[in-house]
Amino acid sequence: MKRSKSSRRWLDEHVNDPFVKRAQKDGLRSRSSYKLIELNEKDKLIRPGMLVMDLGSAPGGWSQVAGGIVGEKGRVLATDILPMGGLDNVDFVQGDFTEDAVFQQILDMLDGRQPDLIVSDIAPNISGVAAADQAASMYLVELTLDMVRQVLKPGGNYVVKVFQGEGSDEFLKDVRSSFEKVVIRKPEASRPRSREVYLVAKGFKG
């Protein structure tokens, strides 16, 4: 089957991507790990002993970074509809976190605790239809904000990937209504032509 120009371009970029090569060398699960590493260096998000939740975690790039920082006295609770291999200091729930049974499983694992930080690098399966992809992306990030409002510790922090486009400004306002401070970051590991940015929201109002 002949590949489309866009898929060929992605493959060429991926093969030659310095962050892909670096991830392989450093033993990290994905190039996206470096996005969280950079965000953490700038915004001091993760500390040893913390409880972190990772929404849309597979293949585990962010959970791997967070688990390494929180250490044995901390914990990362990760969830995704896709399977994810085991990682140190990480508990994983497979399923759709908006479904009652999966949400209850997450609550059971929290056991009354509230996360200090919720992170999400979640993205929909891309269809190639820009308007549909943007709508799907905004729907997913709104679901992560719903989870934040249900379980995040007051004063806690939230990091989420957003694709700039229809609905993103309204989502930013919505996040700002629930947090003391929100900044927009574009990590070095984000591909230059990507519309993705990361909202770093601090001081959940509860």
Curated annotation (Swiss-Prot):
<feature type="binding site">
    <location>
        <position position="60"/>
    </location>
    <ligand>
        <name>S-adenosyl-L-methionine</name>
    </ligand>
</feature>
<dbReference type="Pfam" id="PF01728">
    <property type="entry name" value="FtsJ"/>
</dbReference>
<comment type="function">
    <text>Specifically methylates the uridine in position 2552 of 23S rRNA at the 2'-O position of the ribose in the fully assembled 50S ribosomal subunit.</text>
</comment>
<keyword id="KW-0698">rRNA processing</keyword>
<comment type="similarity">
    <text>Belongs to the class I-like SAM-binding methyltransferase superfamily. RNA methyltransferase RlmE family.</text>
</comment>
<keyword id="KW-0808">Transferase</keyword>
<protein>
    <recommendedName>
        <fullName>Ribosomal RNA large subunit methyltransferase E</fullName>
        <ecNumber>2.1.1.166</ecNumber>
    </recommendedName>
</protein>
<dbReference type="GO" id="GO:0005737">
    <property type="term" value="C:cytoplasm"/>
</dbReference>
<feature type="binding site">
    <location>
        <position position="121"/>
    </location>
    <ligand>
        <name>S-adenosyl-L-methionine</name>
    </ligand>
</feature>
<dbReference type="InterPro" id="IPR002877">
    <property type="entry name" value="RNA_MeTrfase_FtsJ_dom"/>
</dbReference>
<keyword id="KW-0949">S-adenosyl-L-methionine</keyword>
<feature type="binding site">
    <location>
        <position position="80"/>
    </location>
    <ligand>
        <name>S-adenosyl-L-methionine</name>
    </ligand>
</feature>
<feature type="binding site">
    <location>
        <position position="62"/>
    </location>
    <ligand>
        <name>S-adenosyl-L-methionine</name>
    </ligand>
</feature>
<keyword id="KW-0963">Cytoplasm</keyword>
<keyword id="KW-0489">Methyltransferase</keyword>
<dbReference type="InterPro" id="IPR029063">
    <property type="entry name" value="SAM-dependent_MTases_sf"/>
</dbReference>
<dbReference type="InterPro" id="IPR015507">
    <property type="entry name" value="rRNA-MeTfrase_E"/>
</dbReference>
<feature type="active site" description="Proton acceptor">
    <location>
        <position position="161"/>
    </location>
</feature>
<dbReference type="GO" id="GO:0008650">
    <property type="term" value="F:rRNA (uridine-2'-O-)-methyltransferase activity"/>
</dbReference>
<feature type="binding site">
    <location>
        <position position="96"/>
    </location>
    <ligand>
        <name>S-adenosyl-L-methionine</name>
    </ligand>
</feature>
<dbReference type="InterPro" id="IPR050082">
    <property type="entry name" value="RNA_methyltr_RlmE"/>
</dbReference>
